């Protein structure tokens, strides 16, 4: 199956997880097409000064791959800076947040996969 850019589902998430601003999501596939392995497969875009608030993953885990911009992340209370080409994994039971500290949009691939507990 081929999907052109204009066919991909897009959504807006204001103040995601208590963050600042509105995150734009472009979904590669829908959760229902993922055969029960996960719930997010796409590109997240955070405007300058925006963020996704600190939160904990339960029965799933998340992977980030930075494509554009500069991100300040908190990974289990440890702060770091990510640049294009960097990645981060927040495993089940762990916590994280991400903030755009650059002057252009922060774009990154975001994938949330279920753990065995969730897939049952």
Which residues make up each language-model segment?
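Histidine-centered metal-chelating micro-motifs
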Residues: 51-53, 72, 88, 92-98
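Short, conserved beta-strand element in jelly-roll/cupin
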Residues: 45-47, 56-73
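A short, N-terminal "cap"/entry segment at the start of jelly-roll beta-barrel domains
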Residues: 1-38, 119-120
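A generic "binding-loop/recognition-motif" signal
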Residues: 48-50, 59-60, 78, 94-95, ...
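Conserved short histidine dyad/triad with adjacent acidic residue
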Residues: 27-31, 42-57
